[in-house]
């Protein structure tokens, strides 16, 4: 909404400038040349505008990259772009009572629908369960939170899970598991060790298997790595005594998530399936919290920059009016209307804002290029164990537009009061000014 209002305001300013260039060219030329009469003031004001614009551009690019990397990390740590659930999934803590039955048939029907399959990169079911895992040779055991995954799709859906020992799950060997780094440390388990797994299956009985440790992974999220275990979906279904899954994850070829969700919901309604659909953003409370925090900080920075620019422009224009009082009154005395005088000063404010905006973009791109040569080393986020290298994203059209628009808009607004003040000078009193 605020961008729409800003765009409307800029449209009005552009119409005003084009009108002056076409029908009042002398006024536009006179206002532009006036910028060079007091070069020091013009340069200092332009530099202040550029500092604000560059700050918005660089921090906005940093925020964009942070959102992008957090989004990709969220999607590719076994969440996907879209998830399908049984409605009971969010109503009970016993996941065995909220399974999606006959997953294989559901997957086949979705892939046979070309309106959906054309946008799908990967589709995979996952079965959630928990229990106790033991390593008898080391006399260690621990609680685990298990995930049955399809090995091949999980390479994409879990691509941010970094394998630090061994390898990912095999499509052929179904008697192997991978553990989170923290859980493997608790069990003192290493590649090739045999682990005993016990759980309560969907029928209320005991499920038990002995499986071989194929690999150890790290997602960078400590709480998850301390309890995480993955095994092939077929093995997990055998252990739990079901052919269902807890959820179906879909990774898309593009980011048209909302459009795909609408088509998927239509498909579900058409087939009368008792299922619900959620996007990756709905499934990630952590992302929503981080987005709200960083967006709030960014808004505050934009507000501060806008106030600084308004103050600098207003102060410069006021000083300009004081120094040019005799000039203004002379123009008024030879017949210039108050509206004409206001137009001259408004154009000056718009021109200096435009110069500052262009300079902000040029310097912003140069500094972003220098920073991106090496990146910015970032510490781990709260609850995570791995830091990352951040960069400045410069391909966001909205950010580029904002960096240009904000200086122009704020300088135009800051010129209004000084322009009105100049047009209302009393001619007889102003001639006495020295």
Residue locations for each model-derived region?
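Short helix-loop junctions at transmembrane helix boundaries
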Residues: 1-7, 66, 343, 358-403, ...
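Peri-transmembrane interface segments
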Residues: 2, 66, 259-311, 320-322
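N-terminal Sec/SRP start-transfer signal
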Residues: 3, 15-58, 434
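C-terminal membrane-exit region of the final transmembrane helix in multipass inner-membrane proteins
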Residues: 19-26, 31, 395-434
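Hydrophobic alpha-helical transmembrane segments of multi-pass inner-membrane transport and secretion
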Residues: 39-66, 292-327, 350-359, 409-413
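Hydrophobic, regular-secondary-structure patches
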Residues: 60-143, 168-173
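Basic-flanked hydrophobic alpha-helices used for secretion and membrane insertion
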Residues: 182-278
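Transmembrane alpha-helical interface segments in multi-pass membrane proteins
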Residues: 318, 327-371
């Amino acid at each position: 909404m605020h961008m729409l209002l800003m765009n409307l305001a800029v449209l009005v300013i552009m119409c005003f400038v084009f009108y002056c260039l076409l029908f009042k060219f002398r006024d536009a030329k006179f206002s532009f040349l006036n910028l060079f009469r007091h070069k020091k003031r013009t340069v200092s004001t332009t530099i202040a505008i550029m500092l604000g614009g560059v700050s918005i551009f660089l921090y906005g690019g940093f925020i964009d990259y942070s959102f992008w990397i957090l989004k990709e990390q969220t999607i590719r740590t076994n969440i996907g772009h879209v998830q399908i659930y049984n409605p009971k999934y969010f109503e009970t803590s016993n996941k065995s009572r909220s399974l999606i039955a006959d997953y294989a048939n559901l997957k086949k029907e979705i892939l046979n629908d070309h309106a959906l399959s054309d946008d799908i990169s990967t589709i995979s079911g996952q079965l959630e369960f928990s229990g106790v895992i033991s390593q008898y040779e080391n006399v260690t055991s621990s609680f685990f939170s298990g995930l049955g995954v399809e090995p091949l799709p999980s390479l994409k859906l879990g691509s941010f899970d970094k394998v630090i020992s061994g390898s990912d799950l095999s499509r052929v060997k179904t008697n192997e598991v991978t553990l989170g780094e923290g859980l493997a440390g608790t069990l003192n388990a290493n590649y090739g060790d045999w682990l005993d797994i016990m759980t309560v299956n969907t029928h209320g009985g005991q499920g038990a298997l002995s499986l071989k440790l194929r690999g150890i992974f790290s997602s960078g999220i400590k709480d998850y790595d301390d309890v995480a275990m993955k095994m092939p979906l077929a093995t997990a279904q055998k252990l739990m005594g079901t052919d269902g899954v807890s959820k179906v994850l879909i990774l898309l070829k593009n980011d048209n998530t909302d459009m795909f969700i609408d088509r998927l919901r239509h498909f579900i309604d058409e087939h009368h399936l008792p299922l619900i659909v959620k996007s990756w953003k709905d499934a990630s409370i952590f992302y929503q919290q981080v987005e709200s925090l960083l967006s709030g900080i960014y808004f505050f920075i934009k507000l501060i920059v806008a106030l600084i620019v308004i103050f600098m422009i207003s102060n410069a224009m006021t000083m300009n009016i004081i120094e040019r009082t005799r000039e203004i009154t002379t123009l008024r005395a030879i017949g210039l209307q108050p509206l004409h005088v206001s137009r001259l000063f408004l154009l000056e404010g718009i021109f200096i804002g435009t110069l500052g905006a262009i300079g902000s973009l040029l310097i912003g791109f140069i500094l972003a290029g220098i920073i991106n040569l090496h990146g910015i080393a970032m510490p781990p986020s709260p609850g995570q164990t791995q830091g990352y290298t951040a960069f400045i994203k410069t391909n966001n059209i909205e950010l580029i537009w904002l960096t240009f628009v904000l200086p122009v808009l704020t300088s135009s607004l800051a010129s209004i009061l000084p322009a009105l003040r100049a047009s209302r000078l009393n001619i007889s009193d102003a001639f006495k000014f020295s």
